[in-house]
Structure formats: C-alpha cells, structure tokens
C-alpha cells in the first residue's frame, strides 16, 4: 500500500454535506473558521476540513487575507485548516452580507436548497466537511495550503461523484431512509478524489509530503516505512531496498520532507502509537513493542518529546476530551 493510502485508511474520516443553495446575484455569506463550525457540525471532532462544490454559475471565494479565488462549475474549493472566508457572486456583492438564515438551515440539518439573493445570475452549490484527527492526518494536512481548488469535471469519475452527491442531497432533503449515510460515504470519496487531483497537479519543483509521494525514490521509501514501521530500519537498509545510495536517499528525503528518513520513521511510529492509545485499551508496553521499540522507557521518552506528555496521560486526556465534547453535543 502506498503511504498516501496508508494514512487515509488508518484515519477515521467522517464526511457530510451540510448545506445546499441556489442563490441569485448579488449574494454573499461569511463562513466562520473551523473552530466555530466544529461546534455546529461535529462537536466530537478534533478537526474539520471545509469544502464547497460549485454546480452552476460563477462564484468568488475571498480569504480574510484578501486572496481571491474564482470558481467555475465543477470546481471544488477546500479549506484544509478550516480558515474563515467569504463566498459571493463577486461583482455587486459587498460586506456586510445579508442574513439568509444559513445558520438555521445548518442547525436543522435541512438539505433542501436555500433560495436567496438579488434576482441575477444563478449559482448552485453544496457545502460539506470532513473530520479527522490532525495528529494522524498531519503528513497530509501539513502539506496543504490554506485553500486550494480543483475541477472534478475533467473525467467520468468526477462527473459520477458530482451527480451522485446531488442525487443524494435531493434524497436527504426528502427524508429518504439511508440517504444521509450514503451521502457521508460519498463525501469521503469526494475528499480523497480531490486530494488525488491536487497531488497530480503539483509542479515538478513542489516539495512537501504530498509531492514526495509522487517521487519514485521518496514515494517508494515512504511506502516501505509505512508498510513495515516496526522493522529495525537503517538508512543503509532502506536505501538498498529503494535502489539508491544512502547519501542520495537522505538528500532526497530531506529535499521533499525537510527531514531524514529515520527522523520521519520515528514520528510515524509515534503517530501510530497515538492512534493505538486513542482507539484501544492495550498496554503501553505492547504498543511500544508493536511499533518497533524494544524498551518501554525509550518509547515513553520519545512519545513525550513528540506530544509533550507521557503515553498514559495522553490517553487519559484524550478520553476526557471526548467525554466533554459528547456531553456538550448532548446539551
């Protein structure tokens, strides 16, 4: 399995479409940051990635920094770090935007399209989100900008995803049994497909973890480290399996990931340990051995360096945090 798939398969992604609209120009609204949206959409989540998929018409996304991104039909715009932003018809739309009752629609989970605006050109779109653990998704999230867009209408797979999501949004709005669960799975597929399209569009000069997965040397090295994380790797062993000199391997990893292979392996092992501490009741010594540590004490020291606290406290605080979030969600 490649490293990209390995991370995504090991992280519990939960997706949903939370809003559908048919606005007429001029129109505009402000989407708060994920800190605010998490409480509204997924109170038990530790991180929310937001996205908008434009179905018809034109739109402009403006970040609080002033950066503007024009959207065409089929464009999906993603906010990996949950940055606040404005979305509007562009020309003729100005702050402060009217109150269209979006918050009420989101709160009620009503997916029937909201109709609003000034009577001009029509824009149809849906808004969705993905939840994930930022520690376990770190390699992917850290390699993404504050905002990016791709167009999913460039092939049949993208058309199928778009049409399927629109069909299920209509079904969910009418209350058909099972439509919400199917929509959640499709939202996850759309997110992964969008990431793949983003990676395939990176320039040859681009660095970072995502770009590294495309490089024949770094990509193969990452796949080996992920598939055999507990193996007692050395730079020389990994270089031999990849088919390159040790010095060239280290240089290539450092160029793309800004760290040497064994440094990356250590962090990946500790992320696997964090996942096990969160999701299982296995003992710390067993987890340490499973990821390649012969000494529990050495594992404890490494874990504290990475996460700022020993494994036992990390597990206890994670459980407490989940309990508090669930209690708030029930209030």
What are these regions (language model features)?
Residues 189, 193-199, 220, 224-271, ...:
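Basic/polar phosphate-binding segments, predominantly the helix-turn-helix DNA-binding elements
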Residues 109-136:
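Alpha-helix-centered segments that form part of catalytic cores
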């Amino acid at each position: 399995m490649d490293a990209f798939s390995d991370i995504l398969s090991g992280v519990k992604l939960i997706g949903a479409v939370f809003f559908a609209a048919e606005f007429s120009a001029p129109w505009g609204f402000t989407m708060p940051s994920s800190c605010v949206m998490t409480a509204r959409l997924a109170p038990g989540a530790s991180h929310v990635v937001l996205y908008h998929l434009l179905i018809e018409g034109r739109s402009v996304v403006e970040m609080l920094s002033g950066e503007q991104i024009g959207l065409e039909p089929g464009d999906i715009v993603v906010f990996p770090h949950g940055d606040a932003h404005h979305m509007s018809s562009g020309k003729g739309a100005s702050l402060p935007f009217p109150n269209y009752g979006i918050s009420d629609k989101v709160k009620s989970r009503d997916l029937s399209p909201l109709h609003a605006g000034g009577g001009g050109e029509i824009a149809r779109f849906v808004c969705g989100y993905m939840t994930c653990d930022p520690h376990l998704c770190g390699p992917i999230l850290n390699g993404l900008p504050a905002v990016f867009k791709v167009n999913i209408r460039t092939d049949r797979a993208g058309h199928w995803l778009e049409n399927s999501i629109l069909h299920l949004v209509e079904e969910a709005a009418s209350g058909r049994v099972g439509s919400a669960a199917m929509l959640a799975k499709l939202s996850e597929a759309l997110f992964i497909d969008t990431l793949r399209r983003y990676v395939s569009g990176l320039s040859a000069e681009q660095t970072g973890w995502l770009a590294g997965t495309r490089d024949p040397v770094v990509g193969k090295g990452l796949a080996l480290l992920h598939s055999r994380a507990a193996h007692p790797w050395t730079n020389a062993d990994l270089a031999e399996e990849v088919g390159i000199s040790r010095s060239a391997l280290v240089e290539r990893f450092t160029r793309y990931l800004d760290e040497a292979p064994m440094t990356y392996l250590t962090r990946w092992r500790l992320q696997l340990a964090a996942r096990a501490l969160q999701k299982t009741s296995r003992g710390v010594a067993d987890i340490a051995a499973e990821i390649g540590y012969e000494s529990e004490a050495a594992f404890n020291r490494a874990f504290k360096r990475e996460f700022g606290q020993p494994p036992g406290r990390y597990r206890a605080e994670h459980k407490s945090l989940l309990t508090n979030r669930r209690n708030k969600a029930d209030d």
